[in-house]
């Protein structure tokens, strides 16, 4: 057994390994080996069962041993710089392997059909390479023990599986980020233990099969970014499905009967489709729902009051629909990073999200996933027909990061309670009928990076301190009675008596700006004066002159030894990241 993972910096394979013949486990991960894969490592150690070379800088092809290696069980060479073709006979020379991870390399060409000889294989991960062609039929027949098949982010094409299919124990199938065509194969119905099915970012067409809703173990279904069409399936959920991603397809029809019964849902993403009708009242029974993404559809009617029953919501996106009526004062949005199972909060236990979700932040659509999504919360109700006042209760969402209510018909004033949105980064209230002034309390929002109230009926002076000093004219345009920086007008233009002179107006208009030339000149004079005072003190007082030179000498020595001590570390750091 040899385990050097992350403990030393080798740069090359340790030479003593060439003389080892009885090793059963070798773990040389994360030590930045930078050379080709040595065939003698497998050839010499015929008893080797576990080989881990994760996250190094290995390059060239993966060389097989000269003879069959019947003891190797786990092979992980992920996150390296391997290139070329995967050896066509890999399944013949390594017939008893149970775990193969070759992801994150530069392998190209087709997937060898000899993988089908690995009858004990349980996990095959070839994701994030440059593989092309189709999935070999022999792989789907011979790998009878396969539990995880991960081929994401390659250039694979053709039908997903042929009719001949024998992966009965398959639990996780990830084929996202390829060029697969055709419909979802009915043969997947035989995978009764399937928990994760990710076919996103392909060219799959047809309808959503009814039998997907009958797969009792299915937890994650991702069919987003395809060409799937037809109506939403009725009575779809008879399972414990938790995450459902169907965005950016051509789905249509009503939500009325589509997902009733999916009471374990955490994620429901139907954005960028042609969904019609209203949001059904039974949405309030989805007590675990954290992410409700229904933007860019044709949903109409009012926002149902039952939505307020969803206490776990982190992201709500109902934008670009035809919703009407008032904004519910009871809407909630809470970051998952603080929530525990009992409803209390714990910052150390975020909910991990592996699949990305699109959400518009700071006027740009971003994809959030993983821990970042777990710490993120927001509400987007923009581009609808919402009316009435903005509820003051919205100001109680002190964990929300994004609030977008733009392009509606909202009236009334901006609630002063928005000053309680301590985590807010983007606040968009543009294109409404809001009136009154911008509450001065909003200057306490220290994380506010985007603020937009353009094209309303606001009046009064624009706050010009803290974050508000960073917003440009586009944040306020279209409000006739707003004045102050950064708008090129002053309140005196509206209410100034006739006796006031034009010179007075111009002086007040220019009060927002600083003469750069005067600033630079005054700064230079001040700087020179400070230097002259210091020089005069040192010349007159011998004691201070001695202290000053002593301080200079000590500082110079400290800087010198700091650079010498850290130079080796910096050189090593640059070398470690050379291949990345």
In which residue ranges do the predicted regions lie?
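Terminal membrane/secretory targeting segments in land-plant proteins
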Residues: 492-580
